[in-house]
């Protein structure tokens, strides 16, 4: 009988991650059941995680320090586990973005089935450049030809994945007001009902545009979705915000006001309005909206 060949590290990575395939499952329902950590819910996430786990495999296979520590080139994923911190430090040293490093840590945590205790860089809001001003890619999206799409995004705040899957059946009218029901392509599979915001004319245009969508919508790669979501967040916040002067001096002041820190130190928001904007966007954290969406309010 011939010797059974041991799978390569890349084959082990592929097999392990494929065993977690949960395409079509509801992450929202799994989260409520406490089992969301067992699955990978989208093809794009699977592809991204496998790609970056392979970068880790390349690192350990090519590292003289790893070979010296083991006495041989690593053969199994378990042998590689100890060198995850060294890989993360190496990636940070290469100057990779905080987002990329954290994503690689998440990919490796999924591969090994545990939350890794790693020292990761913190996101600095001031370093974020994307969607914070005019970019070359914006020139590829005609404002004239896409005026209805742009108006819709400003009025409704969909994510790119949500916009691709919206259809006419997602329009809701409650007490005379238009809403969008987001149930497909949402982050974590969590559904939400978001008000359509804008002037009466803009709202009607957005509602009509939604009726033209089919659930299989092409979204231009150059569309700056985050910036449009920021405009939507500002609209929701402004509608819900109370006068800060009316909240000061009360016993509820600390609970009613959100005071920013870091580079936005001193800026104060109405906490209740922040939560309204956060939920309309599909988040549930006031700090996310204050730090990453209301920059147009500064």
Report each predicted region and the residues it spans.
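Alpha-helix N-cap/helix-start motif at helix boundaries, enriched for small hydrophobics
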Residues: 46, 161-166, 277
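Short basic/aromatic active-site micro-motif
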Residues: 220-274, 283, 288
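C-terminal catalytic core of Y-nucleophile DNA break-rejoin enzymes
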Residues: 186-232
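Non-catalytic DNA-binding core/recognition domains of DNA-processing enzymes
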Residues: 37-115
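Basic, Lys/Arg- and aromatic-enriched nucleic-acid-binding interface segment
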Residues: 131-160, 261, 268-274
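Conserved tyrosine-mediated DNA breakage-rejoining catalytic core shared by Y-recombinases
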Residues: 132, 165-203
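N-terminal DNA-binding module of tyrosine recombinases/phage integrases
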Residues: 1-39
